[in-house]
């Protein structure tokens, strides 16, 4: 238990343990995109990144973004560049460069991403092929997913959600088990 008597001792231990110190720093500065915000894409496919998400990006010092189609759902995913690089490093570390199938997996993973930048007004351009893949025409919904942001077409986001009862049961099942190791991103 943390109290004023042992606080100094705990920080002395943290100071000697670079891994623990790194993990504490990581926990304090990690990005948190939360909530859902509706927006509109213009005729060119430009859309404003919601101000709350821009503030999180600016606070992290990472304003470069990577955009790709979600692997499992009909939405797009915006990654801050630092998070994207971590994902690439994890995937590359698990794949064998000398295995043809694994090279194809990596090639497809990195070839389906595009760097996007915010203009002076806080907008970014969603390329036409991504608009088509996600079914985005005009109405857009941003959903903060912690370290990434999902971009959905109009009402498609709601269709992907569970009912309240189903969500409660799923969450109960997950929380009743031991947590997985923290090595995944």
Protein language model regions, located:
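Flexible "stalk/tail and boundary" regions
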Residues: 1-36, 43-44, 53-121, 129-185
């Amino acid at each position: 238990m943390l109290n004023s008597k042992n606080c100094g001792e705990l920080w002395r231990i943290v100071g000697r343990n670079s891994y623990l110190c790194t993990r504490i720093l990581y926990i304090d500065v990690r990005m948190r995109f939360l909530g859902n915000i509706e927006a509109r894409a213009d005729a060119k496919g430009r859309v404003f990144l919601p101000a709350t998400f821009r503030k999180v990006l600016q606070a992290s010092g990472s304003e470069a973004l990577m955009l790709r189609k979600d692997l499992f759902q009909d939405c797009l995913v915006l990654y801050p560049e630092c998070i994207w690089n971590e994902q690439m490093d994890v995937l590359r570390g698990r794949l064998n460069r000398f295995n043809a199938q694994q090279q194809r997996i990596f090639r497809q993973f990195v070839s389906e991403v595009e760097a996007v930048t915010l203009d002076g007004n806080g907008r970014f351009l969603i390329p036409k092929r991504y608009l088509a893949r996600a079914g985005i025409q005009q109405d857009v919904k941003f959903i903060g997913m912690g370290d990434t942001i999902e971009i959905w077409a109009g009402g498609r986001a709601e269709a992907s959600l569970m009912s309240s009862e189903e969500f409660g049961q799923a969450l109960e099942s997950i929380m009743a088990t031991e947590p997985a190791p923290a090595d995944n991103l």
